[in-house]
Amino acid sequence: MEFLFGRRKTPEEMLRQNQRALNKAMREMDRERQKLEQQEKKIIADIKKMAKQGQMDAVKIMAKDLVRTRRYVKKFIMMRANIQAVSLKIQTLKSNNSMAQAMKGVTKAMATMNRQLKLPQIQKIMMEFEKQSEIMDMKEEMMNDAIDDAMGDEDDEEESDAVVSQVLDELGLTLTDELSNLPSTGGSLSVAGAKKGEPSAALADADADLEERLNNLRRD
Protein backbone atom coordinates (compact mmCIF):
# COMPACT_ATOMS: atom_id res chain seq x y z
CA MET A 1 0.00 0.00 0.00
CA GLU A 2 2.82 2.42 0.78
CA PHE A 3 4.34 1.61 -2.61
CA LEU A 4 1.08 2.53 -4.38
CA PHE A 5 -0.07 5.56 -2.41
CA GLY A 6 3.19 6.69 -0.85
CA ARG A 7 4.30 6.59 2.74
CA ARG A 8 2.30 8.72 5.13
CA LYS A 9 4.38 11.56 6.49
CA THR A 10 4.85 11.94 10.19
CA PRO A 11 3.86 15.20 11.93
CA GLU A 12 7.53 16.08 12.38
CA GLU A 13 8.21 15.62 8.66
CA MET A 14 5.21 17.79 7.78
CA LEU A 15 6.43 20.50 10.13
CA ARG A 16 9.89 20.44 8.54
CA GLN A 17 8.35 20.64 5.06
CA ASN A 18 6.21 23.64 6.02
CA GLN A 19 9.21 25.27 7.66
CA ARG A 20 11.23 24.97 4.46
CA ALA A 21 8.34 26.44 2.42
CA LEU A 22 8.07 29.42 4.75
CA ASN A 23 11.81 30.06 4.65
CA LYS A 24 11.71 29.98 0.85
CA ALA A 25 8.81 32.46 0.79
CA MET A 26 10.70 34.85 3.09
CA ARG A 27 13.78 34.73 0.85
CA GLU A 28 11.66 35.52 -2.24
CA MET A 29 10.01 38.44 -0.46
CA ASP A 30 13.41 39.78 0.54
CA ARG A 31 14.50 39.70 -3.10
CA GLU A 32 11.33 41.50 -4.26
CA ARG A 33 11.68 44.10 -1.53
CA GLN A 34 15.28 44.78 -2.56
CA LYS A 35 14.15 45.26 -6.17
CA LEU A 36 11.49 47.75 -5.07
CA GLU A 37 14.02 49.64 -2.96
CA GLN A 38 16.34 49.90 -5.96
CA GLN A 39 13.40 51.13 -8.05
CA GLU A 40 12.59 53.67 -5.34
CA LYS A 41 16.11 55.08 -5.51
CA LYS A 42 15.86 55.35 -9.30
CA ILE A 43 12.50 57.19 -9.10
CA ILE A 44 13.94 59.66 -6.59
CA ALA A 45 16.88 60.34 -8.91
CA ASP A 46 14.51 60.86 -11.89
CA ILE A 47 12.31 63.21 -9.85
CA LYS A 48 15.31 65.35 -8.97
CA LYS A 49 16.42 65.37 -12.61
CA MET A 50 12.96 66.37 -13.92
CA ALA A 51 12.60 69.04 -11.25
CA LYS A 52 15.87 70.63 -12.33
CA GLN A 53 14.56 70.66 -15.90
CA GLY A 54 11.30 72.29 -14.78
CA GLN A 55 9.07 69.42 -15.94
CA MET A 56 6.66 69.56 -13.02
CA ASP A 57 3.96 67.42 -14.66
CA ALA A 58 6.40 64.53 -14.96
CA VAL A 59 7.55 65.18 -11.40
CA LYS A 60 3.98 64.80 -10.09
CA ILE A 61 3.46 61.51 -11.97
CA MET A 62 6.76 60.06 -10.72
CA ALA A 63 5.94 61.24 -7.19
CA LYS A 64 2.78 59.10 -7.29
CA ASP A 65 4.89 56.14 -8.48
CA LEU A 66 7.29 56.76 -5.60
CA VAL A 67 4.47 56.72 -3.06
CA ARG A 68 3.05 53.53 -4.57
CA THR A 69 6.47 51.85 -4.56
CA ARG A 70 7.06 52.76 -0.92
CA ARG A 71 3.67 51.28 -0.01
CA TYR A 72 4.62 48.03 -1.74
CA VAL A 73 7.91 47.94 0.15
CA LYS A 74 6.03 48.42 3.41
CA LYS A 75 3.57 45.64 2.48
CA PHE A 76 6.42 43.25 1.70
CA ILE A 77 8.00 44.04 5.06
CA MET A 78 4.70 43.36 6.86
CA MET A 79 4.09 40.13 4.93
CA ARG A 80 7.60 38.89 5.70
CA ALA A 81 7.05 39.67 9.40
CA ASN A 82 3.82 37.66 9.38
CA ILE A 83 5.47 34.71 7.64
CA GLN A 84 8.33 34.84 10.13
CA ALA A 85 5.80 34.75 12.99
CA VAL A 86 4.20 31.66 11.45
CA SER A 87 7.65 30.11 11.08
CA LEU A 88 8.35 30.72 14.76
CA LYS A 89 5.02 29.10 15.65
CA ILE A 90 5.94 26.05 13.58
CA GLN A 91 9.30 25.89 15.34
CA THR A 92 7.46 25.99 18.65
CA LEU A 93 5.20 23.17 17.47
CA LYS A 94 8.28 21.13 16.55
CA SER A 95 9.72 21.71 20.01
CA ASN A 96 6.44 20.76 21.65
CA ASN A 97 6.20 17.66 19.46
CA SER A 98 9.74 16.65 20.44
CA MET A 99 8.85 17.19 24.08
CA ALA A 100 5.69 15.12 23.67
CA GLN A 101 7.66 12.27 22.08
CA ALA A 102 10.17 12.38 24.93
CA MET A 103 7.38 12.33 27.51
CA LYS A 104 5.77 9.44 25.65
CA GLY A 105 8.99 7.44 25.92
CA VAL A 106 9.32 8.26 29.61
CA THR A 107 5.71 7.25 30.19
CA LYS A 108 6.28 3.89 28.51
CA ALA A 109 9.40 3.31 30.62
CA MET A 110 7.52 4.18 33.81
CA ALA A 111 4.66 1.86 32.85
CA THR A 112 7.13 -0.96 32.23
CA MET A 113 8.79 -0.40 35.61
CA ASN A 114 5.42 -0.32 37.36
CA ARG A 115 4.48 -3.63 35.77
CA GLN A 116 7.78 -5.20 36.82
CA LEU A 117 7.68 -3.88 40.39
CA LYS A 118 4.93 -6.01 41.89
CA LEU A 119 4.22 -4.81 45.41
CA PRO A 120 3.10 -8.13 46.96
CA GLN A 121 6.29 -9.85 45.80
CA ILE A 122 8.44 -7.02 47.16
CA GLN A 123 6.65 -7.19 50.52
CA LYS A 124 7.17 -10.96 50.62
CA ILE A 125 10.88 -10.52 49.88
CA MET A 126 11.25 -7.91 52.64
CA MET A 127 9.46 -10.11 55.18
CA GLU A 128 11.70 -13.06 54.29
CA PHE A 129 14.75 -10.83 54.60
CA GLU A 130 13.73 -9.68 58.08
CA LYS A 131 13.04 -13.28 59.12
CA GLN A 132 16.44 -14.51 57.96
CA SER A 133 18.14 -11.53 59.62
CA GLU A 134 16.51 -12.37 62.96
CA ILE A 135 17.56 -16.02 62.63
CA MET A 136 21.13 -14.97 61.88
CA ASP A 137 21.19 -12.62 64.90
CA MET A 138 19.91 -15.38 67.18
CA LYS A 139 22.53 -17.84 65.94
CA GLU A 140 25.29 -15.27 66.36
CA GLU A 141 24.16 -14.54 69.93
CA MET A 142 24.09 -18.25 70.79
CA MET A 143 27.58 -18.74 69.38
CA ASN A 144 28.90 -15.77 71.36
CA ASP A 145 27.35 -17.11 74.57
CA ALA A 146 28.90 -20.53 73.97
CA ILE A 147 32.33 -19.01 73.38
CA ASP A 148 32.02 -16.84 76.49
CA ASP A 149 31.04 -19.85 78.60
CA ALA A 150 34.00 -21.83 77.34
CA MET A 151 36.70 -19.17 77.46
CA GLY A 152 35.38 -16.11 79.16
CA ASP A 153 35.80 -16.89 82.93
CA GLU A 154 39.58 -17.05 83.10
CA ASP A 155 40.03 -14.11 80.78
CA ASP A 156 37.55 -12.02 82.76
CA GLU A 157 39.30 -12.80 86.05
CA GLU A 158 42.72 -11.92 84.68
CA GLU A 159 41.37 -8.74 83.13
CA SER A 160 39.69 -7.77 86.42
CA ASP A 161 42.95 -8.27 88.35
CA ALA A 162 44.79 -6.12 85.82
CA VAL A 163 42.22 -3.34 86.16
CA VAL A 164 42.42 -3.41 89.99
CA SER A 165 46.22 -3.25 89.90
CA GLN A 166 46.13 -0.35 87.47
CA VAL A 167 43.65 1.58 89.64
CA LEU A 168 45.73 1.02 92.78
CA ASP A 169 48.89 2.13 91.01
CA GLU A 170 47.24 5.30 89.77
CA LEU A 171 45.77 6.02 93.23
CA GLY A 172 49.16 5.55 94.85
CA LEU A 173 50.82 7.99 92.47
CA THR A 174 48.13 10.58 93.09
CA LEU A 175 48.36 10.32 96.87
CA THR A 176 52.14 10.52 96.73
CA ASP A 177 52.01 13.71 94.68
CA GLU A 178 49.57 15.34 97.14
CA LEU A 179 51.57 14.36 100.22
CA SER A 180 54.74 15.82 98.78
CA ASN A 181 53.09 19.27 98.73
CA LEU A 182 51.99 19.24 102.43
CA PRO A 183 54.09 21.39 104.89
CA SER A 184 55.67 19.51 107.82
CA THR A 185 56.60 20.79 111.35
CA GLY A 186 58.62 17.93 112.68
CA GLY A 187 60.59 17.17 109.55
CA SER A 188 59.84 16.42 105.90
CA LEU A 189 58.08 13.24 104.89
CA SER A 190 60.13 10.83 102.82
CA VAL A 191 57.81 10.85 99.84
CA ALA A 192 60.47 10.40 97.24
CA GLY A 193 61.25 7.01 98.66
CA ALA A 194 57.66 5.80 98.53
CA LYS A 195 57.08 2.84 96.28
CA LYS A 196 54.40 2.51 93.72
CA GLY A 197 51.68 0.06 94.67
CA GLU A 198 51.74 0.97 98.46
CA PRO A 199 48.83 3.45 98.98
CA SER A 200 48.14 2.19 102.57
CA ALA A 201 51.57 3.34 103.85
CA ALA A 202 51.15 6.75 102.23
CA LEU A 203 47.76 7.21 103.90
CA ALA A 204 49.18 6.25 107.31
CA ASP A 205 51.96 8.85 107.00
CA ALA A 206 49.42 11.51 106.05
CA ASP A 207 47.25 10.71 109.11
CA ALA A 208 50.27 10.84 111.44
CA ASP A 209 51.35 14.21 110.07
CA LEU A 210 47.85 15.63 110.43
CA GLU A 211 47.58 14.36 114.05
CA GLU A 212 50.93 15.90 114.95
CA ARG A 213 49.86 19.28 113.55
CA LEU A 214 46.64 19.14 115.60
CA ASN A 215 48.62 18.42 118.82
CA ASN A 216 50.86 21.39 118.17
CA LEU A 217 47.82 23.62 117.75
CA ARG A 218 46.42 22.42 121.13
CA ARG A 219 49.72 23.23 122.88
CA ASP A 220 49.65 26.75 121.47
Swiss-Prot record:
Pfam families cross-referenced by the UniProt entry: Snf7 (PF03357)
Location of the region described as Disordered in the Swiss-Prot/TrEMBL record: 179-208
Keywords, comma-separated and alphabetical: Coiled coil, Cytoplasm, Endosome, Membrane, Protein transport, Transport
Membrane topology type: Peripheral membrane protein
Segments forming a coiled coil: 12-53, 199-220
Cellular compartments annotated: Late endosome membrane; Cytoplasm
InterPro entries assigned to the protein according to its UniProt record, in alphabetical order: Snf7_fam (IPR005024)
Superkingdom, taxonomy of origin: Eukaryota
Entry keyword Zinc: no
Locus of motif MIT-interacting motif: 208-218
Gene Ontology CC entries for this record: late endosome membrane; nuclear envelope
Single GO BP term: nuclear membrane reassembly
Complex and partners: Probable core component of the endosomal sorting required for transport complex III (ESCRT-III). ESCRT-III components are thought to multimerize to form a flat lattice on the perimeter membrane of the endosome.
Family, similarity comment: Belongs to the SNF7 family.
Function, in words: Probable core component of the endosomal sorting required for transport complex III (ESCRT-III) which is involved in multivesicular bodies (MVBs) formation and sorting of endosomal cargo proteins into MVBs. MVBs contain intraluminal vesicles (ILVs) that are generated by invagination and scission from the limiting membrane of the endosome and mostly are delivered to lysosomes enabling degradation of membrane proteins, such as stimulated growth factor receptors, lysosomal enzymes and lipids.
Protein name per UniProt: Charged multivesicular body protein 2a
Species this protein is from: Xenopus tropicalis (Western clawed frog)
